[in-house]
Amino acid sequence: MRIGLFGGSFDPIHLGHLLAASQAQEVLCLDRVLFVVAARPPHKVPVAPAEARYEMTLLAVAEDPRFTVSRLELDRPGPSYTVDTLREARRLFPQDELFFITGADAYRDVLTWKEGERLPEYATLVAVARPGYPLEEAPLPVVPLFVPEVGISSTEIRRRLKEGRSVRYWVPRAVEVYIEKHGLYR
């Protein structure tokens, strides 16, 4: 099988993430895409708790059989290091072809990650292209993934929510309801 591991903090997950996952599944002919929610990312501090981000991601992908959500990082103590996640994924899926998918902005700093230079040993690296982050300058070989630009970011969603503005059509409806119910990002 060909499995995509889509890593991110998903704080919150939004339609741009889902579009990227769908594009990756189609372009890379993936049998499934696992969303790997970063529990404790070492390079940034999430706003929402890890379990809330996990639950929102579950809600976002619930109706798409191509997508599942993994607890690989949530159930492991300590910081969420990508190399540890990919090692564990390789152990769980020894016969499968793995693809690690994340934004091009993250890859520019990949060599500062714990054992970042070893990531290609465990999975093919796939970078979702973003304006301002040229992939030809990536420090490791990556497969570029071009996704229609939607101009949605988790940062902008959090800002809108803090200002009391709507995020309808930015996140799946179930995620919007969850955010409202739990008073996140206010």
Curated annotation (Swiss-Prot):
Pfam families, alphabetized: CTP_transf_like (PF01467)
Name listed for the protein in its UniProt record: Probable nicotinate-nucleotide adenylyltransferase
Origin organism lineage: Bacteria, Thermotogati, Deinococcota, Deinococci, Thermales
Top-rank lineage group of the source organism: Bacteria
Catalytic activity line of the entry: nicotinate beta-D-ribonucleotide + ATP + H(+) = deamido-NAD(+) + diphosphate
HAMAP family to which the protein is assigned, alphabetical: NaMN_adenylyltr
GO terms assigned for molecular function: ATP binding; nicotinate-nucleotide adenylyltransferase activity
GO annotation, biological process: NAD biosynthetic process
Family under the similarity heading: Belongs to the NadD family.
SUPFAM superfamilies (UniProt xref): Nucleotidylyl transferase
EC number(s) given by UniProt: 2.7.7.18
Pathway: Cofactor biosynthesis; NAD(+) biosynthesis; deamido-NAD(+) from nicotinate D-ribonucleotide: step 1/1
Keywords: ATP-binding, NAD, Nucleotide-binding, Nucleotidyltransferase, Pyridine nucleotide biosynthesis, Transferase
Described function: Catalyzes the reversible adenylation of nicotinate mononucleotide (NaMN) to nicotinic acid adenine dinucleotide (NaAD).
Presence of the UniProt keyword ATP-binding in the record: yes
Record-linked PANTHER family: NICOTINATE-NUCLEOTIDE ADENYLYLTRANSFERASE-RELATED, PHOSPHOPANTETHEINE ADENYLYLTRANSFERASE
